[in-house]
């Protein structure tokens, strides 16, 4: 029987699932087994019936084998689970749902937006995106894989409650994630059902508000990303705008005024059913780590599909005010820079931003983190921006090194296959964002250090001299010199730079084992090969 792998140092075991985040996961005093109906010794009598689960809000749920709403963030790998993940979100999920959908279409002719939000095509697209994103379960304990079975049983009931205005969103589940600058950031995880409904609203409302957003806003918008924001700042720096107003909003998502936000939404949305549903999501509350429920009179919970759109709606007046004053700026969610040519203008711009944010938006500017400084000294979206290039910030490099150290820790007792798989996925994701930097020296330095960490892991895993000798010979080391390395008393870190070890564990061989080649990825992004011209058709022979 294979030995179970141990978790990374400082992380929870993957087998523990979502239910054991931070060592506890309660819902008003009930255990996860009591909420989902999975038999754990204290569940209801219904939970002992095979394939039956008790949903805390919607009642009994017949779940096919392999689709029990377990506390997992990923499907279990069974054929039934894989099939469920590919299932379309059919509106005719339960008895009477087909007639309900028809009545909905006939009875909503006065509101095209509401009809579009609940249309089968829009709900199917919302479910597809939620399924692709995955994520942890909400307070009801239902995973993404278990949602199709839930919808087949209760889809008609959910649609009926949405239609007659009696649907009540569930509170979000509070979880904490570490910040790059230290401390922890609170996230609110909605249930899968609420994620689908929020995503359906966001898809339709996004088209309504997209035309109202500023060209200097780059977050959570189609065809725009953080790289575009960084390029815009670099273009401004190249024009001589080298002084920056680096303004930080104190806990923006936790301090959004609901009345102001709903007034902004109501400027474009007239349907009271849409406005009522958005307001209920804002006031749904949060279940804390200790199981207590807390009201949310202010703020937008981070973690839901609707939150990014609401953040852009809330901050659009700030964009328009800066544009009215002729300021050059770039905003990505609540992170933004205002660019000016000199220090005097920067001080004046800082006063304008503080007065508008605190007076009109009723938000707070974090004076400890806001400053006026040279652009090259400011960090924006993890990068330092100069006139001619974009560099990685020290915090971004430290984050990379810390994560790679954990993944290549000599005390993490897992196979090299799993270790390198985790390393490859992390490096590909990290570099996919930070590849915009044009600092070749940083790329080479990080790549060299990462490969040294991997060679250290191999040397540690081989342990004894005979094993090391046999492995080196198998990898092509010279027989007359291999004993010099295999019998060395030097530590693993020092041996990772040994010429014999490096000649055996070459960069090319490490790449075949799953170690990414950072210089090759960087060159492929910044200097892509030219497209080959299409071959010309042979000329026709002249007819005499």
Tell me what each language-model feature is.
Residues 1-152, 156:
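Non-catalytic, polymerase-adjacent accessory regions of viral genome-replication enzymes
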Residues 118-121, 171-175, 180, 282, ...:
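Core structural elements
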Residues 151, 155, 446-454:
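Short amphipathic alpha-helical coiled-coil/interface segments
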Residues 157-176, 180-181, 204, 212-377:
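Conserved polymerase palm-domain catalytic core
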Residues 283, 360-430:
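A conserved non-catalytic segment of reverse transcriptases
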Residues 295-300, 405-419, 429-442, 459-466:
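Short, solvent-exposed helix-loop connector elements
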Residues 458, 462-544:
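Extended C-terminal regions of large enzymes
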């Amino acid at each position: 029987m294979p030995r179970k792998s141990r978790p990374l140092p400082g992380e929870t075991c993957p087998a523990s699932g979502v239910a054991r985040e931070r060592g506890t996961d309660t819902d008003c005093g009930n255990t996860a087994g009591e909420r989902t109906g999975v038999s754990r010794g204290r569940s209801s009598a219904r939970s002992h019936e095979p394939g039956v689960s008790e949903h805390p809000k919607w009642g009994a749920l017949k779940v096919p084998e392999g689709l029990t709403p377990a506390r997992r963030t990923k499907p279990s790998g069974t054929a039934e689970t894989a099939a469920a993940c590919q299932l379309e979100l059919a509106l005719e999920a339960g008895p009477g749902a087909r007639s309900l959908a028809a009545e909905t279409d006939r009875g909503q002719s006065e509101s095209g937006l509401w009809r579009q939000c609940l249309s089968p095509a829009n709900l199917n697209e919302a479910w597809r995106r939620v399924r692709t994103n995955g994520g942890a379960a909400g307070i009801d304990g239902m995973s993404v894989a278990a949602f199709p079975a839930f919808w087949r049983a209760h889809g008609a009931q959910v649609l009926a409650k949405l239609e007659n205005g009696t649907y009540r969103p569930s509170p979000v589940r509070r979880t904490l994630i570490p910040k790059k600058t230290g401390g922890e950031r609170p996230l609110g995880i909605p249930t899968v059902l609420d994620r689908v409904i929020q995503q359906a609203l966001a898809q339709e409302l996004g088209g309504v508000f997209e035309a109202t957003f500023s060209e200097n806003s780059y977050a959570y918008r189609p065809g725009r990303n953080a790289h575009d924001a960084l390029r815009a700042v670099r273009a401004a720096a190249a024009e001589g705008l080298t002084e920056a107003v680096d303004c930080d909003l104190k806990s923006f998502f936790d301090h959004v005024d609901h009345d102001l936000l709903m007034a902004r939404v109501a400027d474009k949305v007239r349907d009271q059913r849409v406005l009522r549903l958005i307001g209920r999501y804002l006031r749904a509350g949060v279940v804390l780590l200790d199981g207590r429920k807390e009201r949310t009179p202010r703020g937008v919970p981070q973690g839901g599909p609707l939150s990014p759109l609401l953040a852009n709606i809330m901050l659009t007046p700030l964009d328009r005010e800066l544009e009215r004053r002729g300021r050059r700026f770039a905003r990505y969610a609540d992170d933004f820079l205002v660019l000016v040519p000199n220090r005097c203008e920067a001080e004046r711009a800082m006063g304008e931003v503080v007065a508008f944010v605190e007076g009109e938006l009723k938000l707070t500017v974090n004076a400890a983190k806001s400053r006026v400084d040279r652009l090259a000294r400011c960090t924006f979206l993890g990068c330092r921006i100069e006139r001619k290039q974009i560099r990685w910030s020290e915090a971004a490099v430290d984050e990379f090194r810390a994560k790679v150290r954990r993944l290549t820790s000599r005390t993490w007792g897992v196979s090299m296959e799993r270790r390198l798989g985790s390393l490859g996925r992390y490096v590909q994701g990290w570099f996919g964002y930070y590849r915009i930097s044009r600092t070749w020296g940083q790329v080479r330095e990080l790549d060299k250090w990462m490969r040294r960490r991997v060679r250290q892991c191999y040397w540690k895993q081989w342990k004894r001299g005979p094993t090391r000798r046999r492995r080196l010979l198998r990898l092509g080391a010279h027989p007359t010199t291999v004993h010099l390395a295999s019998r060395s008393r030097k530590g693993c870190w020092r041996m990772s730079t040994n010429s014999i070890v490096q000649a055996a564990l070459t960069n090319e061989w490490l790449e075949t084992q799953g170690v990414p080649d950072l210089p090759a990825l960087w060159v492929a992004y910044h200097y892509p090969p030219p497209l080959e011209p299409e071959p010309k058709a042979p000329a026709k022979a002249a007819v005499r």
